[in-house]
A protein has these predicted regions:
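Conserved beta-strand/loop subsegment of P-loop NTPase cores
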Residues: 86-90, 113-125, 145-157
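Switch II (G3) loop of P-loop NTPases
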Residues: 58-74
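Inter-motif core of Ras-like GTPase G domains
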Residues: 73-95, 109-113
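Conserved Switch II/interswitch segment of TRAFAC-class P-loop GTPases
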Residues: 83-103, 125-132
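Charged helix-capping and loop-helix junction motifs
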Residues: 101-107, 134-139
Length: 181
């Protein structure tokens, strides 16, 4: 594979970043999950960048970067943000959409200014009925539109390779529609 690109998965605790990198990667994943010292609803938490890689097409190697979404990890964001091929914001379904986290990611990563295809992926969507999930997604679609982003909001299952692949395939299609090589 002659062409290397970067796809970053950013999101809050429990959104599925480590899981999606493990699900998609064709190599052994470098993960930075460590036991949590506070109650976050799970045993392990990501304290750095998780890394995996997949082939996409005949000539592309896609680096998969799982990055914590909390602002205190912004020094990692700087590293990952250079030359991004695509950016996915993972948000765990809940009764109340976490709008502030999305706005923080948009402000920092500047997907419009950097011309980076951007996707919002709703995880744990199985916890919602259809109407609740649609309302949840609509909130994010309105925010994206208000920020000039022609991005998709999609529900995914981070443990399913077919479902998780919808993110890189969508971003690849966005590049194709723009005539990017």
């Amino acid at each position: 594979m002659s062409d290397y690109r970067k796809l970053a998965f950013v999101g809050n605790v429990g959104s599925g970043k480590s899981t999606i990198v493990r699900t998609l990667s064709e190599i052994e994943v470098v993960d930075t999950d460590r036991p949590s010292t506070v109650d976050i609803g799970k045993e392990l938490t990501t304290i750095g960048i998780d890394y995996g890689r997949i082939g996409l097409g005949e000539n592309m190697a896609l680096g998969l970067y799982g990055v914590p979404g909390q602002k205190r990890f912004s020094m990692l964001w700087d590293h990952v943000n250079r030359s991004l091929w695509g950016l996915a914001f993972l948000i765990k379904y809940s009764a109340k959409p976490d709008v502030d986290s999305l706005l923080q990611v948009i402000e920092f990563f500047q997907p419009v200014a950097n011309d980076t295809p951007f996707v919002v992926a709703v995880t744990h969507a199985d916890q919602a009925d259809d109407d609740s999930l649609e309302s949840f997604c609509t909130v994010f679609q309105e925010i994206l539109a208000g920020n000039g982003l022609p991005a998709a909001v999609m529900a995914i299952d981070c443990t399913s390779r077919d479902s998780a692949m919808s993110i890189p395939l969508y971003i690849n299609a966005m590049h194709g529609a723009r005539g990017d090589t």
